[in-house]
Design a protein with these regions (language model features):
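Short, flexible, basic/aromatic active-site loop/helix in glycosyltransferases
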Residues: 136-154
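Short, acidic, metal-binding catalytic loop of nucleotide-sugar glycosyltransferases
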Residues: 25-36
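Conserved donor NDP-sugar-binding/catalytic core segment of glycosyltransferases
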Residues: 101-133
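A short, conserved alpha-helix in the catalytic core of glycosyltransferases
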Residues: 161-164, 168-173, 179-206
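A conserved acidic beta->alpha catalytic loop
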Residues: 26, 43-52, 69, 93-97
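Glycine-rich, basic loop-to-helix element that forms the pyrophosphate-binding segment
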Residues: 67-84
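Short aromatic/hydrophobic "clamp" motif used to bind/position activated sugar donors
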Residues: 89
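Non-catalytic, C-terminal membrane-associated alpha-helical segments of glycosyltransferases
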Residues: 225-226, 243-312
Length: 312
C-alpha cells in the first residue's frame, strides 16, 4: 500500500503470539470508509509465532519492528511511535479487541484540536474465583471513579488505549526510558501531556474490550508490587503532581495493610495462598483478603522499589 496513513496504530507486544490474532482480526474488520491507517507491531524480544503471524498478514498495512531481546514496553512504544507516518498516533495494546469503528473514533476525537484521548478498558476475565470475588467489582469502581474525576486529573488514566496527534508527540517527546519495568510509563506520559498545556480527556465511545492478564490474586499482587515501585519513580520525577498519599492513613484496615507490607513475603506467593482460600471462604471474606494482598503488595513495592525486577 502506497497511501499516506491518517492514523498509525502502535502495538507493543511481548510474547503476544496468542493475543495478536484477535487484535489483527478486529483491525482488519474496521468499517468501510475508515480513514487510512497503518499498524506497527513492535515485537519486544524474538517471538517466532508473532513474527510469522505478522509476515503472513495481508489484510492490513502492517509493519513489524523486532527486538532481538526483551527491552521493555517503553522501548517498544518509542520505536513504534518514531516509525509512525500518520498524524493521529494510537497506542493499542495487543490484548485489546477494538470495535469496528475504533480507528474512525480515535481520528474523529482529534478534529477539534490537539489533545490526549483515552478509552477505558472493558476488562474481560476468564472464570476465576479472583474475578468473581474481587476483579469485576474493582473494575466497576475504577470506571466510576474515572468518569467522575475532575478534568485536571484525567491524565492519571492514560494507559494502553489512547491517542495523540503528531503535534503532541513532537511537543512532549518520547515515553520516559527510566520506567524500565512494569507500570507508570503511561501515567507519566499523560501527566506530561497535561503539563504541556494540552487537554487530556476520556472518550466513552472508545471503551474497548480488554483480555485482562491479571486473572488471579497472585498475578494482580505481583503487578501491584511493581506498580508501587514505579510510582516511587514518578513521584521523584514529578513531586508536584498532586497524587493521593501512597502510604495510607491510620485505621484498623490500613494498619493491616501497613503491617503486611513490611513482611518479606513475595506478593505472588501470598496471592497464591489467597487464591486457594477463595474456593472455600465466604465471598465477603475473600474480597477482603484479595484487597489486603493487593494493597499491601503495592505499598511494599512503593517502600522497596529496588525489589522490582521483572518486565511484563
Amino acid at each position: 500500500m502506497t497511501y499516506d496513513p491518517v492514523a498509525s496504530i502502535i502495538v507493543p507486544s511481548y510474547r503476544g503470539a496468542d493475543r495478536l490474532p484477535q487484535l489483527l482480526d478486529s483491525l482488519a474488520a474496521q468499517n468501510d470508509g475508515t480513514p487510512p491507517f497503518e499498524v506497527i507491531v513492535v515485537v519486544d524480544g524474538v517471538d517466532a509465532g508473532s513474527v510469522a503471524l505478522l509476515e503472513n498478514e495481508s489484510r492490513l498495512d502492517v509493519r513489524s519492528i523486532v527486538f532481538p531481546e526483551n527491552r521493555g514496553r517503553v522501548a517498544a512504544l518509542n520505536a513504534g511511535f518514531e516509525a509512525a507516518r500518520g498524524d493521529v498516533l494510537i497506542r493499542c495494546d495487543d490484548d485489546l479487541v477494538p470495535a469496528v469503528d475504533y480507528v474512525a473514533a480515535h481520528v474523529s476525537a482529534h478534529r477539534d484540536g490537539p489533545g490526549g484521548v483515552i478509552g477505558l478498558y472493558l476488562n474481560e476475565y476468564s472464570a476465576t474465583s479472583y474475578a468473581e470475588v474481587y476483579g469485576k467489582d474493582a473494575d466497576q469502581r475504577f470506571r466510576r471513579d474515572a468518569y467522575s474525576s475532575a478534568p485536571a486529573v484525567v491524565w492519571r488514566y492514560w494507559a494502553g488505549n489512547c491517542s495523540i496527534t503528531r503535534q503532541i508527540w513532537e511537543a512532549v517527546g518520547q515515553y520516559d526510558p527510566e520506567y524500565r519495568l512494569y507500570g507508570w510509563e503511561d501515567v507519566d506520559y499523560g501527566y506530561r501531556i497535561h503539563m504541556a498545556g494540552f487537554e487530556v480527556r476520556l472518550a466513552p465511545d472508545l471503551e474497548t474490550p480488554h483480555r485482562v492478564a491479571a486473572v488471579t490474586t497472585a498475578i494482580r499482587a505481583r503487578r501491584a508490587s511493581h506498580s508501587g515501585a514505579a510510582r516511587r519513580l514518578f513521584e521523584r520525577k514529578h513531586p508536584h503532581a498532586g497524587l493521593p498519599n501512597a502510604i495510607p492513613g491510620w485505621s484498623l484496615w490500613n494498619a493491616l495493610v501497613r503491617g503486611l507490607s513490611r513482611i518479606p513475603l513475595k506478593p505472588a506467593r501470598l496471592g497464591r495462598a489467597v487464591d486457594a482460600l477463595l474456593r472455600v471462604l465466604p465471598r465477603g471474606v475473600g474480597r477482603k483478603l484479595v484487597a489486603l494482598s493487593v494493597e499491601s503488595a503495592a505499598l511494599g513495592g512503593y517502600r522497596s522499589p529496588h525489589s522490582a525486577k521483572e518486565r511484563f
